Amino acid sequence: MMDNHSSATEFHLLGFPGSQGLHHILFAIFFFFYLVTLMGNTVIIVIVCVDKRLQSPMYFFLSHLSTLEILVTTIIVPMMLWGLLFLGCRQYLSLHVSLNFSCGTMEFALLGVMAVDRYVAVCNPLRYNIIMNSSTCIWVVIVSWVFGFLSEIWPIYATFQFTFRKSNSLDHFYCDRGQLLKLSCDNTLLTEFILFLMAVFILIGSLIPTIVSYTYIISTILKIPSASGRRKAFSTFASHFTCVVIGYGSCLFLYVKPKQTQGVEYNKIVSLLVSVLTPFLNPFIFTLRNDKVKEALRDGMKRCCQLLKD
């Protein structure tokens, strides 16, 4: 019996079903999404760093969010593309799982911070620069990054304590923790319950300040007498609100459920939304609805064209 078990740290990812032709089509689609994600988020990081008009807490947090989007998609998509070309691949458990979930935790922490930032900007504008000063912003970002990495210490340790089937075939395109638990030969009920509580704490814990902030923001905006004033105020947080709905909605379906080993195809679809579609959409959401970012992009393109002409 013991010959069929192992404490594996490497797994064979089965990826997506279907013919080789379908895999090539999926490869082209996901490769395009990946390139646009990298370029879009990199552009946001660069213009926030170089354009003085974007030297504010909101865009400082946005640049870190874009950095996390690049990390999340780079952790998952290249391995997924490799699997589509070569019909499955091997992936190391510790590095992939820890980085993936750490980045996700940091992203939700930043979304909560950005909601509070918008609350201060809309509801307490006269004290905005005092409350959201540079030291506060830097410390908030540092805490978010550190918390993201620390939150994965116990889950990774607990996962390494399990023994797995020697086949090590994982029916997913990345090391999904729910599917890892499904491969375990041990009783994972307690670990699943603790992971469920951790997911609730991280997702709901960062969602509460977001909901409270938006409640105050909307109530404040509705008191503005002019329609143009209300539209301008709503535009300051519309892009963030869109990201919150997409990010929290998909992850609540994916992680906040007591039984993590159910619904393989369902998990794959929602995982694609989290790891591919959301990072792809975020640059467009934050640029198309933000006049300052669009102006900075136009000016940057003009400067680049001028340099090429010279």
UniProtKB/Swiss-Prot annotation:
- Tell me its family: Belongs to the G-protein coupled receptor 1 family.
Per UniProt, what is the membrane topology? Multi-pass membrane protein
State the InterPro entries in the record.
GPCR_Rhodpsn, GPCR_Rhodpsn_7TM, Olfact_rcpt, Olfact_rcpt_6C-like
Q: Which residues are glycosylated?
A: N4
Q: What does this protein do?
A: Odorant receptor.
Q: Is this entry keyworded Disulfide bond? A: no
The cellular location(s) given in this protein's UniProt record come to: Cell membrane
> Which keywords appear in this protein's UniProt record, sorted alphabetically?
Cell membrane, G-protein coupled receptor, Glycoprotein, Membrane, Olfaction, Receptor, Sensory transduction, Transducer, Transmembrane, Transmembrane helix
Residue intervals on the Cytoplasmic side:
46-53, 117-135, 214-233, 289-310
List the Gene Ontology MF annotations in alphabetical order: G protein-coupled receptor activity; olfactory receptor activity
Q: What name does the UniProt record give this protein?
A: Olfactory receptor 9A2
Provide an example Pfam family for this protein: 7tm_4
This entry carries the following GO cellular component terms, namely:
plasma membrane
Q: Which residues lie on this side of the membrane: Extracellular?
A: 1-24, 75-98, 157-193, 255-267
Name the gene behind this protein.
OR9A2
Q: Which Gene3D superfamilies match?
A: Rhodopsin 7-helix transmembrane proteins
Tell me yes or no: is Transmembrane helix among this UniProt entry's keywords. Answer: yes
Q: Which residues cross the membrane?
A: 25-45, 54-74, 136-156, 194-213, 234-254, 268-288
